[in-house]
Amino acid sequence: MAWAPLLLAVLAHTSGSLVQAALTQPSSVSANPGETVKITCSGDRSYYGWYQQKAPGSAPVTLIYDNTNRPSNIPSRFSGSKSGSTATLTITGVQADDEAVYYCGSADSSSTA
């Protein structure tokens, strides 16, 4: 059986400071169901979050906050990491339902501080 690739669009987004930082993300990522997808976001902030928006105009859902923390309602296939100035969202075993726009956000301080 052939699988149709997913298109996972990603957009950079900043928050948490009056000074706008430049965040760099790929414009889009495609994958086949079951594959592992890594989306990166580079900038100069200490903390990053990842957000998923499935339909235009709908509220984004927080997938990851403070680099690595996942809300309890988010599936474990979503994980976050940070190395140096680059944050990474990893989707392990991507599903068709994961097709969405993914936003990266950054801040100078932890959201739980």
From Swiss-Prot:
Region: Framework-3, residue numbers: 73-104
InterPro entries given in the database record: Ig-like_dom, Ig-like_dom_sf, Ig-like_fold, Ig_sub, Ig_V-set, IgV_Light_Chain
Region named Framework-2: 50-65
Keywords: Adaptive immunity, Disulfide bond, Immunity, Immunoglobulin, Signal
Residue ranges, annotated region (Complementarity-determining-1): 42-49
GO cellular component, as recorded: extracellular region; immunoglobulin complex
Residue ranges, annotated region (Framework-1): 22-41
Disulfide bonds: 41-104
Name the record gives this protein: Ig lambda chain V-1 region
Native organism: Gallus gallus (Chicken)
